[in-house]
């Protein structure tokens, strides 16, 4: 199990600027939070989601592959940091 935060550098308000993922050992997303520039949070888990958030349809690439893409700045985060973002995004929904 690992946790990832990825800052997405762009100017399109329709897309999130932060992507938070909980990953299993094969790098499949278990839970995901998308944070938008206006402060909106969407989330996905299993068959439930808000907004347009969806879990990836394939395993995420290795950290190094994400990091070499100039539009993304990834960092590994702790379970506690992910859970704080998850609680903020889901409120009483999860």
Predicted regions and their residues:
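Alpha-helical interaction segments
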Residues: 8, 33, 53, 71-77
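Active-site microenvironments that recognize anionic phosphate/pyrophosphate groups
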Residues: 20-22
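Short, extreme N-terminal segment that most often corresponds to the first beta-strand
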Residues: 1-18
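Short, compact, well-ordered microdomains
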Residues: 58-94
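Acidic, aromatic-enriched beta-alpha/helix-loop junctions
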Residues: 24-68
């Amino acid at each position: 199990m690992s946790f990832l935060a990825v800052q997405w550098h762009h100017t399109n308000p329709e897309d999130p600027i932060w992507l938070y993922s909980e990953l299993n050992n094969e790098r499949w997303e278990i839970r995901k939070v998308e944070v938008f520039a206006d402060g909106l949070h969407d989330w996905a888990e299993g068959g439930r989601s808000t907004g347009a958030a969806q879990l990836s349809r394939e395993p995420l690439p290795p950290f190094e592959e994400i990091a070499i893409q100039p539009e993304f700045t990834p960092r590994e985060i702790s379970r506690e940091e992910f859970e704080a973002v998850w609680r903020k995004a889901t409120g009483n929904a999860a």
